[in-house]
């Protein structure tokens, strides 16, 4: 099967941003999820970073970076009017205490039940570093996953059961891939939108679990 059109990382970030509601408190995980900050437009959304920052704006313009203003992924960020800095422990209290509406995280695998594996593949010699992902997965009211649909070797990242170490159990609400948007339901993964030049049957063949129309 040849896919000639699928979402880029930027387009995936735009699609996630479209589903973030006005007034939401949101944590953007390290990596591709941080791109979402650039596509929120005029919506009033409060972006949180686990290193102790609330009220982040989009990425700074080239040449306007402030080395004292970075997110948890060590990327330069901007601060909106009214933004605040606070202790790392206070930041994790926000994460664990259910004060964040949405966490947008990357993933290696998501199971049909919404289990999340995003911090370690079990590869020999690799250094596991879960960071705050477990706190976000269990503490945020909703978890949006942003990931490629397939691995580099063509295997589905949607799986019946996660084979990598878990970050959270039944914590994922929505999955945004370069091919589709899926909702985690008690019955399974429901296709909300197909974002590539394939139909439902072709998407099903590429997915490691049964999908619901």
Curated annotation (Swiss-Prot):
<keyword id="KW-0058">Aromatic hydrocarbons catabolism</keyword>
<dbReference type="InterPro" id="IPR004165">
    <property type="entry name" value="CoA_trans_fam_I"/>
</dbReference>
<comment type="similarity">
    <text>Belongs to the 3-oxoacid CoA-transferase subunit B family.</text>
</comment>
<dbReference type="InterPro" id="IPR037171">
    <property type="entry name" value="NagB/RpiA_transferase-like"/>
</dbReference>
<protein>
    <recommendedName>
        <fullName>3-oxoadipate CoA-transferase subunit B</fullName>
        <ecNumber>2.8.3.6</ecNumber>
    </recommendedName>
</protein>
<dbReference type="GO" id="GO:0042952">
    <property type="term" value="P:beta-ketoadipate pathway"/>
</dbReference>
<dbReference type="GO" id="GO:0047569">
    <property type="term" value="F:3-oxoadipate CoA-transferase activity"/>
</dbReference>
<comment type="subunit">
    <text>Heterodimer.</text>
</comment>
<feature type="active site">
    <location>
        <position position="50"/>
    </location>
</feature>
<dbReference type="InterPro" id="IPR004164">
    <property type="entry name" value="CoA_transf_AS"/>
</dbReference>
<dbReference type="Pfam" id="PF01144">
    <property type="entry name" value="CoA_trans"/>
</dbReference>
<comment type="pathway">
    <text>Aromatic compound metabolism; beta-ketoadipate pathway; acetyl-CoA and succinyl-CoA from 3-oxoadipate: step 1/2.</text>
</comment>
<dbReference type="InterPro" id="IPR012791">
    <property type="entry name" value="3-oxoacid_CoA-transf_B"/>
</dbReference>
<keyword id="KW-0808">Transferase</keyword>
